[in-house]
């Protein structure tokens, strides 16, 4: 027969044993109840780096550098130069000395294209993101006017606006708003420093043409790639970014 006194002794023995078990660490792979360790929402500091990293990797995977390197830049310049209208046609109409300059260029090739570190800025209201895509490249120029090969360093920024929009089915998407080259961001300079007066004059004239043509040309290649990359981003990352933009949460952006 099980006596009450025995029950009291048994309970007394179990009490310290239970306390010891509770003090033991949780085995690996075992999740504690939410009441003990409440789940934390993804923090904005994680989003900025994750987004720029995903966009950068995506652009490289889409072949951005190869696309830039294979641009038929000289053919495009000569085609537009012969056209009676357009920015370049207007420029050549005003400065007729540029026509023989184009005709005397034997080769104009992009080499060593680079995608530099992406930048990220948030709008003051917190509902939009602006991604800066900085590009660098070298222009190899051969011309009958100059005996040696000229190397021009080129830098250009493309700015992409990202925002959250709601469709007719009330689904929210992360989309590209404006995508354009940053005004005044194009930099072209002679890698070997200042050349002789004829060489520097040639570089200045060529720079004037490239200022009107190159930004729009590069923009036309980069912006469609951004759309393609955006459509393939990790769903969880997109959801977190959209949620932050809708609520105007400030991203912590490391400079």
UniProtKB/Swiss-Prot annotation:
Q: Which domain of life is it from?
A: Eukaryota
Q: What is its main location?
A: secreted
Expression sites (tissue/organ): Expressed in trachea, and at lower levels in nasal epithelium.
Which GO molecular function annotation, any one, does this entry have?
lipid binding
The record's section on Pfam families has: LBP_BPI_CETP
Q: Which UniProt keywords apply?
A: Antibiotic, Antimicrobial, Disulfide bond, Glycoprotein, Immunity, Innate immunity, Lipid-binding, Secreted, Signal
Sites where a glycan is attached:
157, 178, 205
| Chain residue ranges for the region called Important for surfactant activity and antibacterial properties | 87-92
The record's GO CC annotations read:
extracellular region; extracellular space
Entry annotated with the keyword Nucleotide-binding: no
One BP annotation, GO: surfactant homeostasis
Q: Which family does it belong to?
A: Belongs to the BPI/LBP/Plunc superfamily. Plunc family.
Record's subunit section: Monomer. Interacts (via N-terminus) with SCNN1B, a subunit of the heterotrimeric epithelial sodium channel (ENaC); this inhibits proteolytic activation of ENaC.
| Biological role stated in the UniProt entry | Lipid-binding protein which shows high specificity for the surfactant phospholipid dipalmitoylphosphatidylcholine (DPPC). Plays a role in the innate immune responses of the upper airways. Reduces the surface tension in secretions from airway epithelia and inhibits the formation of biofilm by pathogenic Gram-negative bacteria, such as P.aeruginosa and K.pneumoniae. Negatively regulates proteolytic cleavage of SCNN1G, an event that is required for activation of the epithelial sodium channel (ENaC), and thereby contributes to airway surface liquid homeostasis and proper clearance of mucus.
| The protein's name in its UniProt record | BPI fold-containing family A member 1
Q: Source species, please?
A: Bos taurus
């Amino acid at each position: 027969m099980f006596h009450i006194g025995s029950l009291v002794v048994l309970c007394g023995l179990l009490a310290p044993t239970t306390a010891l078990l509770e003090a033991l660490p949780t085995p690996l792979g075992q999740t504690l109840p939410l009441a003990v360790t409440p789940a934390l929402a993804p923090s904005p500091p994680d989003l900025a780096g994750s987004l720029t990293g995903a966009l950068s990797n995506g652009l490289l995977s889409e072949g951005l550098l190869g696309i830039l390197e294979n641009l038929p830049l000289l053919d495009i310049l000569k085609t537009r130069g012969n056209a009676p209208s357009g920015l370049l046609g207007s420029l050549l109409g005003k400065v007729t000395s540029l026509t023989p300059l184009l005709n005397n260029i034997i080769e104009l090739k992009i080499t060593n294209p680079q995608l530099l570190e992406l930048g990220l800025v948030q709008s003051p209201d917190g509902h939009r993101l602006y991604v800066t895509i900085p590009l660098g490249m070298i222009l190899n120029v051969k011309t009958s006017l100059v005996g040696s090969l000229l190397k021009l360093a080129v830098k250009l920024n493309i700015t992409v606006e990202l925002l959250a929009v709601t469709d007719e089915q009330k689904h929210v998407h992360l989309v590209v708003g404006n995508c354009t080259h940053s005004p005044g961001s194009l930099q072209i300079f002679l890698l070997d420093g200042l050349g002789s007066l004829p060489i520097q004059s040639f570089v200045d004239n060529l720079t004037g043409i490239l200022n009107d043509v190159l930004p729009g040309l590069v923009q036309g290649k980069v912006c469609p790639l951004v759309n393609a990359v955006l459509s393939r981003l990790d769903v969880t990352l997109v959801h977190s970014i959209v949620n932050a933009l809708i609520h105007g949460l400030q991203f912590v952006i490391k400079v």
